[in-house]
Amino acid sequence: MIPEIGQFALVLALTLALAQCVLPVAGAARGNAAWMAVARPAAQGQFVFVAIAFGCLAWSFVANDFSVLNVATNSNSQLPLHYRVAATWGSHEGSLLLWVLVLTIWSVGVTVFSRHLPDDVVARVLGVMGFISVGFLSFMLFTSNPFDRLLPPAPDGRDLNPLLQDPGMVFHPPLLYMGYVGFSVAFSFAIAALLAGRLDATWARWSRPWTTVAWVFLTLGIALGSFWAYYELGWGGWWFWDPVENASFMPWLVGTALVHSLAVTEKRGGFKAWTVLLAILAFALSLLGTFLVRSGVLTSVHAFATDPKRGIFILAFLAVVVGGALALFAWRAQRVSTGGGFDLVSRESLLLTNNVLLLAAAGSVMLGTLYPLALDALGIGKLSVGPPYFETVFVPLMAPALFLMGVGPIARWKKAALPELALRLRWALAVAVVTALIVPLAMGRFSALAGFGILLAAWIIASSAATLADRVKGSGGAAGIVSRLRGTPRAYYGMLLAHVGIAVFVVGVTLVKSYESEKDVRMAPGDTVELGGYVFRFEGVRDTQGPNYVAARATLTVTQDGRAVATLRPERRLYRVQESPMTEAAIDYGFFRHIYVALAEPVGADAWLVRVHYKPFVSWIWGGCLLMALGGLLAASDRRYRIGARERQPAAYAAEPGAAR
């Protein structure tokens, strides 16, 4: 009965989604207030029914209802409770339901936090989001029903993929989906602006906080996925340029460009058409990621094995949404004024250059991801594109972008002078150069890669400090400086914090890439190996077991200069149901380094192959991501998006001349 309730709730949600996508948009076109008023209750009702369906599926997993095919395929009676809950979104069908649930959460957010917006704007935005819901609910009900019955019921389930039986995977998909799907709000605002014929600063102000919050979630989701791969897969790597990793990274790159472009459109009225195009592309790449994961064209630890017909459905939906959006853009954008002009050297030109570099970087990642798939689909042959391609193409595009990141915030709008910029940033450049010389030498060996990476990171931090100092210059003493700092918008501090986060990330990537070391060694009880100034002693292996697995657990003691540092216990697990061997690494976490040990396989009566790693500054990679996310949250919480906008923006919108309805 519970699965049938969930199924019926999805049907009702689809009905409301149809009403949400048709009536409000038609009402906005006709000026019919009653039809426009349908948008909010339809979106809220849709959320209620999708949440009921999600709860029914979660209950089926928790209750071990193996008469549901989804549960029988992705769970087991021995699976711990928290992983049974996480198994709700561990399958293709369940994760698709999570996708729709997240979409309805964003829709409800629009209904709650956009009460100050004109009714026709909200109607169009929610109408577009309703259309997206119709597509995914239809896809789920007709090709990927999470409540399909299995009769007679299975005596037990096949178990959840052991790779997913990890706390990181409990939180990684929801965070990632909140980012993926969050770009649908910016997309919907852009389409609403195109439909209304009002591509002005107003729509940019309305959509900017939504875009920033979505970017924050996507940043956290990607970072958590990277950290999960680092400690769970046993390879010691934090990014593999896996096609599905790339599928989440591409919208992040374009979303980063969109966040900056929205700022220019809001503050200066420029980049109007460009910003709309970025909003379309960011969500298009989110849909592309959905296609890659669910179409069956990929082999990946992230991908779902699915029926190719599902891929055709998603591809058709992708073509309709993106093709329709681009056609509307081509029709409307030519009527939009370009905004005020600006010189070749100005903050606008620097931001535009950075946008182009980010878009080119996303394009290079897309080429490396899709080109092998296209060759395979055309029967030309199989080709593997690995890290050497991505690092060779991606890094040269990002280096100038990182340099411009230090110049842009201090440059003047409209027109800036190079001599003036050089004068204001001379100390930042000096600090960056000195730091780039000192840090590699302090690491014990000079590396050109390390020096270049530290130069860029130190440049970003020093120029951010110079930008803040320039802002308070001439404030008239300590009291004036404090007053100026208090009056500075949160969005400004959020920008600086996010930029510092990128610098910290670059430090982590540069130093771990330049100075990490690893060894694969055969170790028996009593054997030792030295790495990175640490001595690892293999004490032996004993058998242990968990709720649904058995494991061989090794013990290694780590010392430095005769002083005990850590005791590490890596495991080699065998999950009983699927007979899947898994490596559980043991890590001693430190602010400046990680000591990483993985137990590979037995190579004798008492001997094992052991992989040991010394990774300096690797934690700064994820620390930088956290700082980026905190900067985004700080920017999104700017009071300008809550106070004053309620009175100013609708009035400005209503006063806009020549708007098409």
Kindly give the residue locations of the regions a language model identified.
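Membrane-interface helix-loop-helix modules in multi-pass inner-membrane proteins
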Residues: 51-126, 141-162, 222-266, 289-312, ...
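Short, aromatic-rich amphipathic segments at membrane interfaces
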Residues: 86-87, 161-166, 592-620, 624
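Membrane-interfacial loop-to-helix junctions in multi-pass inner-membrane proteins
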Residues: 29-50, 112-133, 195-216, 241, ...
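Structural signal for the C-terminal ends of transmembrane alpha-helices
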Residues: 25-31, 108-117, 188-199, 259-266, ...
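Contiguous transmembrane helix-bundle modules in multi-pass membrane proteins
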Residues: 1-34, 52, 66, 243-253, ...
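Soluble non-transmembrane domains of integral membrane proteins
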Residues: 519-611
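A conserved hydrophobic secondary-structure block that centers on an alpha-helix together
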Residues: 11-25, 32, 95-226, 234
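Extended, hydrophobic alpha-helical segments in both membrane/secreted and soluble proteins
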Residues: 174, 181-191, 202-261, 274, ...
